[in-house]
């Protein structure tokens, strides 16, 4: 809702051209809902905007300019099923022990490399332990097979787009000139590659200038996020992206949205007490105007089974109350 209203404000109040807006969220469903809301607010002009996921935005960039790397613009995109099938072949041909190196574990390792913008050559150079060397070798084999198939996997989409913008300043400047307003949702869930993409489009200190062309002023960047809600570290998300935002983008202004519209004050007071123990966070106190609500009940379970049974019983009781 915050991003949607911001976009509507840009177009209707500041007369921003819709085609200069890039809005990024994390799921196709969220992107579709955002597009619908913006169209409702500002009309069909909103269709000129790029409102998409990181992956979809990168696909559009790559379809235009990936041939700079000698890759066909009609490249295929491997989804998770395709990628797993290919990695299974890699693991089989490298005779990896499936118990020690399950296919999914190898895929996760390769995904982590790509999310950190580490190519297979660097992965091999930096591999210090036997498992790291195994993952680096699998990465190299996997990547060579992708190239032979004229394909990119999901992680390649973002990594390759970042490398493209870094390697060819004229391509980067083209998109910096087009997207004068960049908005990113759930910024606390971004990984290093996604962070790097945002910097290439918006930062004022990017390397490389197109000869004979003045450096484009950084785009106006707005991100929405909450460091207290960062839960995707296991997928490569780094909380430092939002914690260091003001240092990464000097002059940024932080607006704290501390009113909660879903929970009662008793719940929020407990949440405030728990989260206050986190280190290095911006202090905020969530509040609500929907009342104190019922007191929180604590229950100690003896086992995971007891815990699950308690939850099931509570849900069953609530359902009975609703139907009564």
Predicted regions, residues:
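Conserved helicase NTPase motor core
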Residues: 1-3, 22-23, 30-31, 50, ...
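Conserved nucleotide-binding/hydrolysis micro-motifs of P-loop NTPases
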Residues: 28-31, 55-58, 112, 227-231, ...
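Alpha-helical scaffold elements adjacent to nucleotide-binding pockets in ATP/GTP-utilizing enzyme cores
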Residues: 6, 33-41, 57-64, 86-89, ...
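ATP-hydrolysis module of ASCE/P-loop NTPase motor domains
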Residues: 46-49, 67-156, 179, 254-261, ...
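Short glycine-/polar-rich loops that comprise or flank the Walker A/P-loop
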Residues: 16-20, 45-48, 83-86, 217-220, ...
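Helicase P-loop NTPase motor core
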Residues: 1, 7, 66, 250-253, ...
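Proline-centered turn/helix-capping motifs that create local helix->coil transitions or kinks
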Residues: 114-120, 206-210, 274-286
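P-loop NTPase Walker
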Residues: 1-73, 77-78, 149, 173, ...
């Amino acid at each position: 809702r915050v991003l949607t209203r911001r976009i509507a404000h840009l177009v209707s109040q500041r007369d921003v051209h819709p085609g200069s807006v890039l809005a990024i969220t994390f799921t196709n469903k969220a992107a579709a809902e955002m597009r619908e809301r913006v169209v409702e607010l500002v009309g069909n002009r909103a269709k000129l905007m790029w409102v998409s996921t990181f992956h979809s935005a990168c696909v559009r960039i790559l379809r235009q300019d990936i041939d700079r790397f000698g890759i066909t613009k009609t490249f295929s995109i491997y989804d998770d099923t395709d990628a797993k099938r290919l990695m299974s072949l890699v693991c089989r041909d490298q005779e990896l022990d499936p118990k020690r190196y399950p296919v999914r574990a190898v895929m996760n390792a390769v995904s982590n490399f790509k999310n950190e913008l580490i190519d297979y050559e660097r992965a091999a150079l930096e591999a210090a332990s036997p498992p790291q060397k195994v993952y680096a070798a699998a990465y190299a084999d996997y990547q060579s097979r992708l190239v032979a198939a004229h394909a990119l996997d999901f992680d390649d989409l973002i990594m390759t787009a970042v490398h493209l913008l870094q390697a060819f300043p004229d391509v980067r400047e083209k998109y910096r000139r087009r997207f004068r307003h960049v908005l990113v949702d759930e910024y606390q869930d971004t990984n290093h590659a996604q962070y790097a993409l945002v910097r290439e489009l918006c930062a004022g200190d990017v390397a490389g200038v197109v000869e004979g062309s003045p450096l484009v002023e950084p785009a106006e960047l707005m991100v929405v996020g909450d460091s207290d809600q960062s839960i995707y570290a296991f997928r490569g998300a780094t909380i430092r992206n939002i914690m260091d935002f003001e240092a990464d983008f000097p002059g940024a202004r932080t607006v704290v949205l501390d009113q909660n519209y879903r929970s009662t004050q008793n719940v929020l007071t407990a949440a405030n007490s728990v989260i206050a123990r986190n280190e290095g966070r911006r202090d905020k106190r969530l509040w609500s105007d929907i009342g104190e609500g019922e007191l929180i009940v604590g229950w100690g379970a003896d086992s995971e089974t007891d815990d699950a049974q308690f939850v099931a019983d509570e849900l069953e009781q609530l359902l009975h109350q609703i139907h009564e």
